[in-house]
Each structure stands twice: as structure tokens, then as C-alpha cells.
Amino acid sequence: MPVIYASILAKYYGRQRINSDVQTINNIISDAVSVEPKAYRDAMSHYAGAVQIVTTDGPAGRRGLTLTAACSVSDAPATVLICLQKIHEDNRLFIENGVFAINTLAGTHQQLADAFSGRIGLTQNERFELATWERLATGAPVLADALAAFDCRVVSIQDHSTHHVLFGEVIALRSNPDASALIYLNRRYHTLDL
């Protein structure tokens, strides 16, 4: 049970009762059957997500990849999170560099999204050569014509199951509100006019 939730319950019900309730909840949850990974992925394919290219650069090296697993956490301080698969060893570069940029793709960026997803089989250098990149504050590559770009320093890392979850404080940002958005839904790209 999250610590914050437990502390709220303790405030209202008292510590002793909370410990008993938490144990009861944990017993119920431990008896529950987990969903099958394929069924979960199939259901999540109906969850529309903004398409992002996340990038990093620094002493450990440069890397970029396409993902939809990014979201806002807080606006004070401005914080986002990204989820990176552990199976790809090179994703450790994001952790080792301690910085990343989230580049929200416009509707015109489908080929770039494919390139950074690895579908085309390009090297990292070849992927970066396909677009114009700039730097804001951290040194992570920022796509010049991104719909929005969030330049972040890593403030927390949580490993969970198959993924590293990186929390980043937004140090700088830029937006281009006149562009359309690229979204991913039903395992396909779609353009959303703004």
C-alpha cells in the first residue's frame, strides 16, 4: 500500500486499525490472479498515447528511442516520468547520463518515430541524422520541430518488473502549438489535428 495512502488512513482511523486493514488488503490482493501479459497488452492497445522520442546524451553516450510510456507527474516542481525496458541494455545510458528530453512528436513525424523504434534497423547515429536536433539546458538532444520538448534531469529512479521508471524534473521546455499530434492507438499511428 502506498505510504501516502497509509498515512492518510492512519490520520482518520488510528495506527492499530490501519495495520490490521492493510494486512487484510494485502491478503486479498495476494490471493488475486494476475492477468495474462498478452491480454494486458491487447487491452492497452486501446489506450491512446502521445508518441514521444526520448533522448539522452552525456559521458555515457547518446541514445534515443520511441515510446508512449511518458506522462506528467507534477507541475510544482514540473516533473515527468518515462518508462524504459530493462531488456535493452543501452537504456542504462539514460540513468548513467542523469538527463533526458521528451520530444512529443507532431503528425508529420511518423517516419522518425519508426526510425527511433528500431523497426527500420538504423544505428543510433543514423537515426539522429534524420532530423535537426538542438540543446536546451541539460545537453539531451531536443527535436527542433517537436510539438513539445521537455528537457529534464533525473531526480528519481524506480525499478519495477520489466522497466526502469525515471522521474525527471523539467529544467527547460519548448512548445510548437501549431502542429498536429502523432498518437498511437490500436498498434498504429494516427494524426490528431489540434
Name each model-derived stretch:
Residues 2-194:
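Basic, polyanion-binding surface patches
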